[in-house]
């Protein structure tokens, strides 16, 4: 899980993510993400802005700063709606938000019959 490195209420809103992490998982500036805060159960959506590469920064801005504060552990997820297969990308990070492992994603389709 990533660690929040900064939390600022007096800002329009967003989450700043180390650009190296963004590149590793294919996040684009302005992309919508879900943020799940492991320390208090809060969940919110916001958009991504890049933080300096190699900084390890995960900063929460705006009203979401009420939900996630410095030191909180978070899971950040992005989704896409498409009729094409998209290979999910997942990484694990250490306490400094540096990638320690790329996780494989194995999905299995479950057929559903409609009457």
What are these regions (language model features)?
Residues 3-84, 92, 96-98:
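Compact, glycine-rich, soluble single-domain proteins
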Residues 80-81, 88-107, 112-115:
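Well-ordered alpha/beta subsegment
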């Amino acid at each position: 899980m990533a660690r929040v490195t900064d939390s600022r209420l007096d800002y329009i809103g967003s989450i700043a993510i180390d650009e190296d992490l963004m590149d590793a998982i294919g996040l684009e500036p302005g992309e919508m993400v879900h943020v799940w805060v492991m320390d208090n159960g809060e969940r919110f959506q916001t958009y991504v802005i890049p933080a300096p590469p190699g900084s390890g920064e995960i900063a929460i801005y705006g009203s979401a700063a009420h939900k996630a504060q410095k030191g909180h552990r978070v899971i950040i997820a992005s989704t896409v709606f498409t009729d094409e297969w998209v290979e999910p990308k997942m990484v694990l990070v250490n306490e400094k938000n540096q990638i320690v492992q790329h996780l494989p994603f194995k999905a299995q389709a479950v057929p559903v019959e409609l009457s």
